Amino acid sequence: KRDFKLCRYTVFAEDNSFSYFTFREYLSYVFSAYRKERPDLSDLIRGFHFEEYTDILLKDLSTGNRKKAFLITAFALKPQLLFLDEPVNGLDFQSTEYLYQQISRYKEHGTILFSSHILESITLTSDRVFVLEHGKVRQTFERGQISAADIREALHYENDM
């Protein structure tokens, strides 16, 4: 059971935990808990435009910057299984693009399971999509079959515009 905890990490849609830690303090805590050496994070910090926020309490960060702190931690940890709940919520355009790049690269390290209501994030990054309804898998799409139109159809999406 303990081994499974060390093989996964979750980035929640909204996370107010560790609010009295700075990002640097949070990193120290997490890498110690996961028994890992902290790698050089400069590329991730730059990629998410987070340079000026590393010494600010997590509670004082905007929703998007708090999300970036947890995403940077997740990608630096490189767990075998990474859960991302609504990963683009709160992110600016550039950080969203960088997130998509990181998700695509991550496939070399492990598996990402993410939930999203943003079709672009699904169609650009997914190898497999499960459309859920009332907690049950309604339809599955494999790589090459994933399109916004098919997902909309599976969701009975109607565009009233």
Model region roles, listed by residue range:
Residues 14, 19-34:
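Q-loop/switch helix immediately C-terminal to the Walker
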Residues 28, 38-54:
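Conserved ABC ATPase "signature" region
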Residues 71:
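Hydrophobic anchor residue at the start of the ABC signature
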Residues 75-76:
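ABC ATPase C-loop
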Residues 82-86:
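Catalytic Walker B motif of ABC-type/P-loop ATPase nucleotide-binding domains
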Residues 93-94:
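Helix N-cap at the start of a conserved alpha-helix in ABC-type nucleotide-binding domains
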Residues 109-115:
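Conserved H-loop
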Residues 136-159:
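Conserved beta-strand-loop-alpha-helix hinge in the C-terminal portion
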